[in-house]
Structures are given as structure tokens and as C-alpha cells.
């Protein structure tokens, strides 16, 4: 079981709610994914009613909501969005996102760290979306973040684990959950992240924008399970050289000698 902030999750696949063609399709895809933690952009919530057209169905499914601060350009805006989320949705869980650049949506490390520090002090369970920066992730852990969410590649790019080598370092040194987020465009990318030792992945665009989101959600669920099993089993090490899986000549020598067809000396000469 995956544990984040003392809460256990049976599924290591987290999903988003954006880009689906309809609310019904979104609900069906989330159900097919088996996800128990679903992120929701605060900018989509109607603060007059405290809801949007998808909030009630999500709550009825029993999933935990992870409101995010997507659209915030600095720490001040992110903190304001977090406080609204706590008041309107009744949750202290938060995916912290601060990306002032609308073209590449790269997370701002300085503003993210400042906001995370303040929000943790207010009792929030902060899951910050960040660059795959091992130093930053370590600092975020030190100030009390519940998990870190380093990117695989830019949001919605479907490029996969471009930051692979840095993710390995983050995973190796972290003592809090590492959730690979952004850029995961295929089930094979999710499987690879889990094989590296990530605790979970968050996927939205690859599911929502596929021709069959429900089937794609199932595919991602299977990929995450397979990747986790492979990691737990222990992957073989890589090598530049070939390594035989069975003796190359010894069995022939033994076989020729024991059958009596030739003596051992002749067997050596034949081989």
C-alpha cells in the first residue's frame, strides 16, 4: 500500500480531470483507472456554490480530491488558492503548482518553495509540482512536504521521462513518496517510472485526449501495476558485454565423455 500523509492508497495511479470531452467520460475513465486520488484545478470551481459540474460525481465515487493551484503565477496567488480550497472543499490536501510562463508551464522553484513552506506551516498536506531537481526535492522534504511531484517532461507534452537520470537521484534520496507528474504520454512511460522506483504517477492528458479514454485508463492502470511488480522483483543490471545464460562448451565436453563416444582427451581436442 502507498501511504501519503498517513493516508493509504491501493492504487498508485493518480489522475486528473481536465481535457475530457464530457463529465460522463471523465467519470468512466477515472473509474476504469482505479484511481483513488484525483486532482482538480481550483480555477474550475465555482466558489459561489463550492462546486463545479464534476465535483459531486467525484465525491460520490469516494475518491480523495487533490485541488491544485494551476494558474497561480507566484506564491501569494498559490497560497490564496490553497486557502480557498480548504474553505470550500474542506481538505488540507494540495497539489502546489506555480508556473508563470504560459508557453512551457515550467514550475517556478523559488516561488514554489516559498509557498510550500508557508502552506506546511498552516497545516496543509503539500504535494509540490517541481522540476526534476534533486536539491529542491530534498529541501521540500526537509520543510515537511507530504510528497514531491517532479516532472517527467513538460505538462501535456507526452514526451515521457526526459528527466530520467534526475528522477533516479530524487527517488534514491527521498524518504517521502515521489510521484512522477507531467509528460507521461503512454502506458510504457508510466511503467518505466514505476520500474525506476517511483511511488506513483499522475496522468491526465494521455488518458483524456486518447481516442478511447476508458480503455487507455485501464491500460495505464495495468502498466503501473506491472512496473511496480518489476521494481519489487529487482531488474537485472545492464552491461556493455554479453553474458551467457548457459555454459558454452562444458556440457558438450561432459556429454561426449560420459557417453563413451570419445575419451575426455579427445573431447577436449574436438572442442
Curated annotation (Swiss-Prot):
GO molecular function: thiazole synthase activity
Alphabetical list of InterPro entries matching this protein: Aldolase_TIM, Thiazole_synthase_ThiG, ThiG
Keywords: Cytoplasm, Schiff base, Thiamine biosynthesis, Transferase
Localization terms from the record: Cytoplasm
Pathway assigned to this chain's UniProt record: Cofactor biosynthesis; thiamine diphosphate biosynthesis
Binding locations of 1-deoxy-D-xylulose 5-phosphate: 156, 182-183, 204-205
Entries under PANTHER family matching the protein: THIAZOLE SYNTHASE
Similarity annotation: Belongs to the ThiG family.
Annotated protein name in UniProt: Thiazole synthase
